[in-house]
Amino acid sequence: NLNQWMLKITAYADRLLADLDKLDWPEKVKKMQADWIGKSYGAEVDFKLENSDEKITVYTTRPDTLYGATFMVLAPEHAMAKSLATDETRADVEAYIQMAANKSSVDRLQGKEKTGVFTGSYAINPLNGAKVPIWLSDYVLADYGTGAIMCVPAHDDRDFAFATKFNIPIIQVIAKDGKEIENMTEAYTEAVGTMINSGEWNGMESSVLKKEAPHIIEEKGFGRATVNYKLRDWVFSRQRYWGEPIPIVHCPDCGAVPVPEDQLPLLLPDVESYEPTGTGESPLAAIDE
């Protein structure tokens, strides 16, 4: 891992969204920008591990479907990924983690064929006490949400494909007109419906429960309402002389020191040549000032 300077654009996520309305841009482009920022409302839910006081926190935009969570998936880079492996699964888990490390995030998200490995461990659904098998899969990224998701295959296409491939139970919890589908051949992803197979939530409208569930979960003490963003801080990697100057001075005594605000913007001096020298030195290395 390399230390990198980053532009903390996530701190401006809400302003970036709000100010899209001030731009004289095509609506299509503004929608693309909004989708890129990706603001979502949901909940973080704590699942305790079976026979343990440890817990895994997942982020979900659909806490109303918690009764339908039949498995959990962690990113292979998740801090607990290796420790969840049992003696029987450890070799497969470590091999899968290594395989995922060799893929880019783009490759992982675009992969049509879902891959994964069962850790051998279980979490406990905090609503109904059901055992939830914990899997690793590279379609979950460590830097989005908590790096762990609860999976509701009856109502998510990706989860449905994963559950079908690995023979994981599928429990429908939202139904059109309250009628359960006898043989599901695809996920029911309609935005509205009536809650079924959901204990005390049965009969509620899913659109209403979606808004109320984060606060119910918070009151019960195993989660909290949360806002999340797809937007990530911007890494300034492979920065060169012709790039944006980063206003940080490297002091031999004090370390990295920010340039005072009254001295901004930082302008680089003119140089005779800014092309690579072949020695790895910066074009600024020859400047005596």
Outline where the language-model segments fall.
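A short local loop/turn or secondary-structure capping micro-motif enriched for an aromatic residue
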Residues: T65-Y67, L141-D143, L267-P269
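Short glycine-rich loop/turn motifs
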Residues: S40-E44, T70, F118-G120
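Short acidic, Pro/Gly- and aromatic-enriched capping/linker segments at domain boundaries
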Residues: K112-G120, G278-E289
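Nucleotide/phosphate-binding sheet-loop regions of phosphoryl- and nucleotidyl-transfer enzymes
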Residues: N3-T10, Y67-Y96, I174, E190, ...
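Catalytic alpha/beta core of large soluble enzyme barrels
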Residues: H78-D177, E182-N183, A187-Y188
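Short hydrophobic-aromatic micro-motifs
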Residues: L7, V58-Y59, L66-L74, V132-L136, ...
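Residue patterns forming the tRNA-binding/recognition surfaces of aminoacyl-tRNA synthetases
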Residues: N1-I56, P63, A148-A286
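Short, charge-rich amphipathic segments
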Residues: A85-I97, V271, E275, P283-I287
